[in-house]
Amino acid sequence: MRIGILGGTFDPIHYGHIRPAIEVKHALALDKILLMPNHIPPHKHQPNLTTAQRLKMVADVCSQLDGFELCDIEAKRDTPSYTVVTLEQLKSLHPEHELFFIMGMDSFLQLKSWYEWQRLFDFAHLVVCQRPGWQLDAAHPMQQILTARSHAHQETHEGHAKNTHKNSGQIFPVTITPQDISSTQIREQLAKGEIPADLLMPITLDYIQNQRLYLP
């Protein structure tokens, strides 16, 4: 089974998370996508909502989307949500499956600042979402890693038959439709009494309004 993993604060979860995940699922023929809320994001400030509230919103979204499931493995943890620890744990639970960890190009460019980043490739492939026509500068230090671990590059240089069994360690660049949406933008709109109906799934907006979340 080919399993995509998209982590995030999801404070709140919105179409800027959901639409790229759907596009990646189709592009790479993934069997399912795990949406994984962080508990204590190491690279971010503490979230505005409780972990339980964010889990509820993500679970609601998953109930509306085919092939999407909530993964609460990080939410249950009392330590920072380091990706390598999570992927190692998921791989031990599903050793026979291929894991595809989804990230944006901005995160990929900061990958060397991540805790034990080299070990990510021991447990999963990386999916790097990029805007149409975007090209990483050839001199950028991450370009060598992107080239060496690119799925297309390895297919060409190692041969398709040899490479098909490889279930971690590759990078899959995927061009996605740009989504000019941020959780900060949504929280600001809600705090002003505006209704960002075009940015959130209806089930998410209903929960936020019913619980009176993000109000000043």
Swiss-Prot record:
Membrane is among the record's keywords: no
What pathway is it annotated to?
Cofactor biosynthesis; NAD(+) biosynthesis; deamido-NAD(+) from nicotinate D-ribonucleotide: step 1/1
**EC class name:** transferase
What this protein catalyses is:
nicotinate beta-D-ribonucleotide + ATP + H(+) = deamido-NAD(+) + diphosphate
Asked if the Swiss-Prot or TrEMBL record annotates the protein with the keyword Repressor, the reply is: no
EC no. given is 2.7.7.18
For this UniProt entry, the molecular function terms from Gene Ontology, in alphabetical order, are: ATP binding; nicotinate-nucleotide adenylyltransferase activity
Name the keywords, alphabetized.
ATP-binding, NAD, Nucleotide-binding, Nucleotidyltransferase, Pyridine nucleotide biosynthesis, Transferase
Kindly list the biological process annotations in GO that this record carries: NAD biosynthetic process
Q: Provide the function of this protein.
A: Catalyzes the reversible adenylation of nicotinate mononucleotide (NaMN) to nicotinic acid adenine dinucleotide (NaAD).
The family this protein is said to belong to: Belongs to the NadD family.
Name of this chain's protein: Probable nicotinate-nucleotide adenylyltransferase
Q: Organism source for this protein?
A: Shewanella baltica (strain OS185)
